[in-house]
């Protein structure tokens, strides 16, 4: 998404897809050790036999080594966290060929520098991740899902802030704006009100998911939410969430033949409404079609800028929207990227976001990879 794998200067691309063995499953300790080429779906298929699952879900069936290298996230990060919170340890091949192990199987440690988190999200610039030790979780006894439309964006976001503050353990909470809802209605033959809409998912016991759903229904009613449709039946849950699952393809269908440029800023959740509103004004003034989806529980949202890549004017307009959005998010105390990473695409914003600490990152890169052979030109520019 940000040019992570593009060989800007040529080079050797390492394919780890054949390193796809699940090496250890430890049900009692709720951890596993896998090779880098194991995919998320492959792991969860095996874990299900033990009544377990790995929750981080970026959408695609990504490899776990790739998810570690990019610091991947997903729709259920609001409850289970991102890859950073779920990695216990790594095996990494360093630029000089040395093999190192970081972390371990203990759930906490105050020993030494946290090299595991340093490699997580490094995008291959510090070493090659070959094995990953992960936390896993017990499969929930029950699920429920719900959908609710709001008169205003502010009401939708404020309801989520209240839900989180009240301690309701929501597993997923996703936001679609009016443009995106209109798109999924047309694409998936649905009939949702074309208003800011929240999609919820709850995990737990049969009793607890009902309690969570009822608690959320009470809270959203206080913030101008419409009817809260929810169900504990799997088929009905799938129907309720179809709009969110189809969002990308529905968005692309708004302008057939064009390309989609996804943005990825993340801001403090109390600034989310303001950031989205200012961004929508910017988009409307340019005339670009750009549906919005968001992981509203952690302040991360995505525009899908629909542009003709053969048009220099349209590309310049899209670039301007993205540039202003990133700077707006950073000014609000947020980040240029909540989950897509830096690659080469977000390099121009690193100094603005990190200030003096950018030089420390540069020194880390040079200490680990003095010859700059590991994915050069990504994450940090060392000149």
Predicted regions and their residues:
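Conserved, mostly hydrophobic/aromatic
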Residues: 124, 303, 369
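Glycine-rich N-terminal segment of FAD-binding domains in flavoprotein oxidoreductases
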Residues: 1-19, 36, 295-296, 329
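Activity-critical C-terminal alpha-helical subdomain
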Residues: 98, 347-383
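Short, acidic (Asp/Glu-rich) active-site segment that either coordinates a divalent metal cofactor
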Residues: 1-5, 12-16, 125-133, 206-216, ...
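Short acidic/histidine-rich active-site segments
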Residues: 295, 335-342, 376-379
């Amino acid at each position: 998404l940000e040019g992570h794998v593009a060989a800007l200067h040529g080079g050797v691309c390492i394919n780890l897809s054949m390193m796809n063995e699940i090496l250890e499953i430890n049900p009692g300790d709720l951890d596993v050790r896998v090779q880098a080429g194991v995919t998320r779906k492959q792991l969860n298929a095996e874990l299900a036999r033990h009544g377990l699952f790995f929750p981080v879900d970026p959408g695609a069936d990504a490899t776990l080594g790739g998810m570690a290298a990019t610091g991947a996230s997903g729709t259920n990060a609001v409850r289970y966290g991102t890859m950073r919170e779920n990695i216990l340890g790594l095996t990494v091949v360093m630029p000089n060929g040395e093999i190192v192990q970081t972390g371990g199987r203990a759930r906490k440690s105050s020993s030494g520098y946290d090299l595991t988190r340093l490699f997580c999200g490094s995008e291959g610039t510090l070493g090659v991740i070959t094995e990953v030790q992960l936390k896993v979780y017990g499969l929930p006894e029950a699920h429920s899902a719900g959908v609710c439309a709001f008169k205003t964006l502010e009401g939708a976001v404020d309801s989520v802030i209240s839900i989180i503050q009240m301690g309701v353990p929501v597993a997923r909470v996703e936001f679609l704006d009016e443009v995106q809802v209109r798109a999924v209605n047309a694409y998936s033959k649905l009939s949702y009100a074309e208003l800011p809409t929240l999609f919820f998912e709850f995990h737990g016991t049969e009793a607890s998911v009902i309690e969570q759903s009822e608690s959320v229904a009470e809270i959203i009613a206080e913030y101008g939410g419409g009817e809260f449709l929810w169900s504990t039946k799997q088929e009905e849950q799938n129907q309720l969430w179809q709009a969110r699952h189809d969002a990308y393809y529905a968005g692309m269908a708004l302008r057939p033949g064009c390309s989609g440029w996804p943005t990825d800023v993340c801001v403090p959740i109390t600034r989310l409404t303001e950031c989205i509103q200012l961004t929508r004004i910017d988009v409307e003034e340019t005339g670009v079609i750009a549906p919005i989806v968001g992981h509203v529980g952690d302040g991360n949202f995505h525009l899908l800028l629909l542009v003709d890549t053969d048009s220099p004017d349209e590309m310049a307009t899209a670039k301007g929207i993205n540039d202003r959005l990133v700077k707006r998010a950073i000014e609000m105390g947020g980040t240029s990227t909540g989950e897509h990473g830096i690659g080469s695409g977000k390099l121009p914003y690193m100094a603005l976001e990190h200030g003096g600490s950018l030089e420390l990152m540069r020194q880390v890169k040079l200490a680990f990879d003095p010859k700059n052979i590991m994915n050069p030109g990504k994450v940090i520019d060392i000149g």
